[in-house]
């Protein structure tokens, strides 16, 4: 649906379709730009975070999410930064779970670095969360500290076990990093599959200034897959989630392996998602500088008609594809905002 609705009331519950016929059914919401780690491909060591006064309240985030659910969103993922470091975030999770109970929402989930999972896993499960993604690039404690700048891997592994004990299905997300974890990816896959967890490998994305050259970090997953195919039997799976990952089954482990390849394969043709930052900015594409302010219409009225109309206008601006490219000449990111702000 593009432009303003002729019937504002109808806009409250109208489905969201972009200019290229893609229906938007998946919302990713960054509840904070803060994180208790500083992964070097994601953040600079001396990050300047958003003033807390600029953030939407948890009640405003709930209202914003609910407006998208009314317009057809079926899957909602909370991200960050690290979502579980947001003060009182579980009140938001518990409140949003009402949409699971009503059937309006099919899935409520989150992506986390795992450091807070030991504390929150059981409560997440009690709120109706069934699956989570955990970002983990290595099982080597020394490498983990190097990547995160100060993290302790035992805390993450404890959190993963707490999540599994609570009945949550866990999928591991790992960024492939040249000369750092590339030799470890086969063993990381065996470990994940051995615990009945999926693994998705991700190429470095050129987002935000991080004080390092991404060309030094970038490892094409086409190369990773070719190497894995020398050791394992990889069978392409036909399943599609409307997202960027392409999946294979691994005969030797019985598990599933995903590849997210923004740099080597455009994954935009079936994109079904949009992203909201913790300040209420809507980004219809991860790899595009587009931005629509939803905080202003959210706060302008207690009636959601202005908000619904603003959402429709923003969806009408969703681009056909992303602008990701590594600027080898000037060493500049394709997108100026950091992943921690966008909520990858």
From Swiss-Prot:
Which InterPro entries does the UniProt entry name for this protein?
Answer: Aldolase_TIM, Elp3/MiaA/NifB-like_rSAM, MoaA, MoaA_NifB_PqqE_Fe-S-bd_CS, MoaA_twitch, MoCo_biosynth_MoaA/MoaC, rSAM
EC number annotated for this UniProt entry:
4.1.99.22
SMART domains on file: Elp3
Binding of S-adenosyl-L-methionine occurs at 41, 81, 135, 205
Q: Which cofactor does it need?
A: [4Fe-4S] cluster
A GO molecular-function annotation: GTP 3',8'-cyclase activity
List the catalysed reactions: GTP + AH2 + S-adenosyl-L-methionine = (8S)-3',8-cyclo-7,8-dihydroguanosine 5'-triphosphate + 5'-deoxyadenosine + L-methionine + A + H(+)
- Residues annotated for [4Fe-4S] cluster 2 binding in this entry: 268, 271, 285
List each copy of the Radical SAM core domain by range: 19-244
Q: Cite the binding residues for GTP.
A: 28, 77, 111, 171, 273-275
Which pathway does the UniProt entry assign to this protein? Answer: Cofactor biosynthesis; molybdopterin biosynthesis
- HAMAP family to which the protein is assigned, alphabetical: MoaA_B (MF_01225_B)
Assembly and interactions? Monomer and homodimer.
According to its UniProt entry, what is the function of this protein?
Answer: Catalyzes the cyclization of GTP to (8S)-3',8-cyclo-7,8-dihydroguanosine 5'-triphosphate.
Q: Which family does it belong to?
A: Belongs to the radical SAM superfamily. MoaA family.
| Protein's name according to its UniProt entry | GTP 3',8-cyclase
- The record lists the organism as Bradyrhizobium diazoefficiens (strain JCM 10833 / BCRC 13528 / IAM 13628 / NBRC 14792 / USDA 110)
């Amino acid at each position: 649906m593009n432009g303003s609705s002729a019937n504002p009331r109808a806009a409250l519950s109208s489905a969201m379709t972009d200019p290229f016929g893609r229906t938007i059914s998946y919302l990713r919401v960054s509840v904070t730009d803060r994180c208790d780690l500083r992964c070097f491909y994601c953040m600079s060591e001396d990050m300047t975070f958003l003033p807390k006064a600029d953030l939407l309240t948890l009640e405003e985030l709930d209202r914003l999410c609910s407006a998208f659910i009314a317009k057809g969103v079926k899957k909602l993922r909370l991200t960050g930064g690290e979502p579980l470091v947001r003060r009182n975030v579980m009140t938001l999770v518990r409140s949003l779970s009402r949409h699971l109970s009503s059937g309006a929402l099919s899935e409520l989930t989150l992506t986390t670095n795992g450091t807070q999972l030991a504390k929150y896993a059981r409560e997440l499960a009690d709120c109706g969360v069934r699956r989570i993604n955990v970002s983990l690039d290595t099982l080597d404690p020394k490498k983990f500290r190097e990547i995160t700048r100060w993290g302790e891997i035992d805390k993450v592994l404890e959190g993963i076990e707490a999540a599994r004990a609570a009945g949550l299905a866990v999928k591991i997300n790992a960024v492939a990093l040249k000369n750092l974890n590339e030799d470890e990816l086969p063993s990381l896959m065996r470990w994940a599959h051995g615990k009945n967890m999926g693994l998705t490998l991700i190429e470095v994305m050129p987002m935000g200034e991080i004080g390092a050259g991404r060309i030094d970090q970038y490892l094409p997953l086409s190369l990773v897959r070719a190497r894995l195919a020398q050791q394992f039997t990889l069978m392409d799976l036909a399943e599609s989630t409307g997202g960027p990952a392409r999946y294979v089954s691994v005969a030797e482990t019985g598990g599933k392996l995903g590849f997210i390849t923004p740099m080597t394969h455009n994954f935009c043709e079936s994109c079904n998602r949009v992203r909201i930052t913790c300040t209420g900015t809507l980004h219809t594409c991860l790899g595009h500088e587009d931005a629509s302010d939803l905080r202003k219409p959210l706060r302008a009225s207690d009636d959601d008609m202005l908000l619904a109309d603003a959402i429709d206008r923003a969806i009408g601006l969703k681009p056909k594809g992303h602008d990701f490219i590594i600027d080898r000449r000037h060493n500049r990111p394709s997108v100026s905002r950091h992943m921690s702000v966008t909520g990858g």
